[in-house]
Regions:
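HIT superfamily nucleotide-processing domains
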Residues: 1-122
Length: 122
C-alpha cells in the first residue's frame, strides 16, 4: 500500500466515509472520534506519517507517544464520564498505525459486548 492509497493518510478527506471527526491534532498525531456508534466517545489516535506499527515510530513520535496517549485518554475519560479508557492497537483492517481508545462505563457499557462491530473479512 502506498500513502496515497491509505484512508488514514487522506486525513479529513475521508472522515465522512470513516464516520469520524477530528477533535485534536499536532505535528505527529491525529485524534478522531466516531460520529455514530454504540460507544459515545470511541476514538482513534493515528500518526500523520504513514507507518504500519508501533515499532516504526521515529524518535520524535516515540518521545511524544506516552504523553499523547495519556492526554487523549484523560480528555476522553473526562468528556464522557467513563470509568476507564481502554487502548487497543489493531491494524488488520487498515495498514496505518492507529490506536482504538474505548471509553468504558461499567458493566452496562456496550463495550462489554463487542467494541468493533461489522463484518470481518480475510
Amino acid at each position: 500500500m502506498t500513502d496515497s492509497d491509505c484512508v488514514l493518510c487522506a486525513g479529513r478527506e475521508m472522515d465522512g466515509v470513516l464516520l469520524v471527526t477530528e477533535v485534536w491534532s499536532n505535528e505527529f498525531w491525529r485524534l478522531t472520534t466516531t460520529t455514530v456508534g454504540e460507544i459515545a466517545g470511541y476514538s482513534y489516535l493515528s500518526t500523520h506519517r504513514h507507518i504500519e506499527d508501533i515499532s516504526a515510530l521515529d524518535g520524535d513520535e516515540q518521545e511524544s507517544f506516552g504523553a499523547v496517549v495519556w492526554r487523549t485518554t484523560s480528555a476522553i475519560k473526562e468528556a464522557t464520564g467513563a470509568d476507564h479508557v481502554y487502548v487497543y492497537v489493531m491494524g488488520d483492517g487498515i495498514d496505518h498505525l492507529h490506536l482504538h481508545l474505548a471509553p468504558w462505563r461499567g458493566p452496562t457499557s456496550p463495550l462489554v459486548d463487542d467494541p468493533i462491530k461489522g463484518l470481518v473479512t480475510r
